[in-house]
Structure formats: structure tokens, C-alpha cells
Swiss-Prot record:
Transmembrane segments: none annotated. GO terms for biological process: Mo-molybdopterin cofactor biosynthetic process. This is Cyclic pyranopterin monophosphate synthase. Substrate binds at L75, C76, H77, M111, E112. GO terms for molecular function: cyclic pyranopterin monophosphate synthase activity. Its EC number is 4.6.1.17. SUPFAM superfamilies: Molybdenum cofactor biosynthesis protein C, MoaC (SSF55040). Keywords: Lyase, Molybdenum cofactor biosynthesis. Belongs to the MoaC family. It comes from Novosphingobium aromaticivorans (strain ATCC 700278 / DSM 12444 / CCUG 56034 / CIP 105152 / NBRC 16084 / F199). CDD domains: MoaC_PE (cd01420).
Length: 157
């Protein structure tokens, strides 16, 4: 028996057929961090980065990326998302991004939440690279998912 969901018995890639699955409310939460120098963090916090507001465009980029996940990730289903939220928190040496994606559908939204975080953090890098080319994007991960056959899952703290 083949346990790989995206590979058929002949080894050919395929998109999983989710047509027979029940529609349920699904939520995924992802998180990641971008580390930077204190001066860079201060400039972003005060809105004085060379490109202006950094977090506004990063939030929009994350939302847009979640909506395009099916175009970016091979064999990922294109989804009609009900909601995507992208939030930022200043931490000691950087910015933490948390994205929540949700829908009522037949497949999960983990990849959409992860893509939102990834692109939001990449946008912060792009908007602030004139100040700090050594920024580090790290620890992008799924922290929670709810819904579907497997129910609720939470990452260990």
C-alpha cells in the first residue's frame, strides 16, 4: 500500500482527490520570526525605515500570499479562504509574525498560514534590507490546526 498521498502506485505525482471528504470548519495558525539589529527594529517600530511603513505592506503581502498558495506550492489545492489574519509582535531582537487562515472546506489551510508568515517576513526583510542585510528569518512553523478528520493539533511549547 502506498502511504504517500501525492504519489500514485506508479510513482507519478498527483493532486489528492478531496471531493468525497466532508466540509468542516478548518483553522491553521503559523508563526515565525525575523531577527535584526536594535537600530533596525527601532526604525521599523517608529515608522522611520527608508521605505516607510514596513508592517502594513508586510501584512498585505502575507494575506495576498495565503490567497495564492495553490499557485505557489505544487499539488496544493487552490482554496476559497474565509479569512486570513496576519499579526506582528515586537520581541527583544526582532518581530514575530502570526498568521491565521480559515475556511469551511474539504482540506486544511496549514500551507496557507505558513505561506502567509513566510511572505510577510520576506516583505519585512525587503522593506528593511537597506538598514540591515543580516536579518535572519527563522522558526517558521505550524503552531495549531483545527478541523478535518484529524481534529485539533497543537505544537509543543
Amino acid at each position: 500500500m502506498n502511504d504517500l498521498t501525492h504519489i500514485d502506485s506508479g510513482g507519478t505525482a498527483r493532486m489528492v482527490d478531496v471531493g468525497g471528504k466532508a466540509e468542516t470548519h478548518r483553522v491553521a495558525i503559523a508563526r515565525g520570526t525575523i531577527r535584526m539589529r536594535g537600530q533596525t527594529l527601532d526604525a521599523i517600530r517608529s515608522g522611520n525605515a527608508p521605505k516607510g511603513d514596513v508592517l502594513g505592506p508586510a501584512r498585505i503581502a502575507g494575506i495576498m500570499a495565503a490567497k495564492k498558495t495553490g499557485d505557489l506550492i505544487p499539488l496544493c489545492h487552490p482554496l476559497a479562504l474565509d479569512a486570513v489574519n496576519v499579526d506582528f509582535a515586537f520581541v527583544a531582537d526582532g518581530i514575530e509574525c502570526t498568521a491565521t487562515a480559515s475556511l469551511t472546506g474539504r482540506t486544511g489551510v496549514e500551507m496557507e498560514a505558513l505561506t502567509a508568515v513566510s511572505v510577510a517576513l520576506l516583505t519585512i526583510y525587503d522593506m528593511a534590507k537597506a538598514l540591515d542585510k543580516g536579518m535572519v528569518i527563522e522558526a517558521i512553523r505550524l503552531v495549531e490546526k483545527r478541523g478535518g478528520k484529524s481534529g485539533t493539533w497543537k505544537a509543543a511549547e
